[in-house]
Amino acid sequence: MLFRSEKELLESWNEVNLYSMTRGINRFKGLVKALTEVQEKYQPVEGLETLVKWVEESDELSNPALEKAVEETGNICLKKALAWSQAVNASIKELPKEEVKPFEGVKEGIEMLHESCDIAIVSSANYEAVKEEWTRFGLIDHVDVVLAQNAGSKKSCIEKLLTYGYDKNKVMMTGDAPGDMDAADKNGVFFYPILVKKEKESWANIGEAKDRLQAGTFAGEYQDALKEKFVKNLTK
């Protein structure tokens, strides 16, 4: 029974985090979904309601913010969530370097974009992990600013970038998760999707997106078609 439960939970975890419209969800939001499923199907999770409340109300879902909440409450579920998150970061660092690499076409695409565009990383991942990976693969030289988990939500990060005077009609958010599209929509900027399991194709076509962005032909039919294809890819 335990083996079956673990298998079902892992499949559910992968569905939530990788292969559905919740792809790219913040790790703590994903954890709440998983633990809620455990509580509903298998056994009670001590202190879960406090973790749920923190995830729903915290302005920043990160390890430092969680550390502060642990100090303030001493809640067992918050403590375990922090230990888990720290273990995730440690595991990421221990991954064999050959297993962590950009998809084919990423470097060429970013280099091409940076010839005529400013590039900002807007990520919900850990800052140190993002910086290390982009540096290791020679991508950081083509980036103008790094905004990661500690900088706030993707929506707020784009909002901050727009205060530097960028024309919304010349801004494109590129990403593989619904949260990326949502952040773009809420800021009134365009969205170019990287399709899961079709990453090579997506990066090969990003040049057309750049050309349309600069020519003012991104809006309308082209943008609508990109979004439709993106949603279908995660809901089929």
What are the language-model segments listed below?
Residues 42-104:
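Metal-dependent phosphoesterase signature
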Residues 8, 30, 50, 65, ...:
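Exposed alpha-helical structural elements
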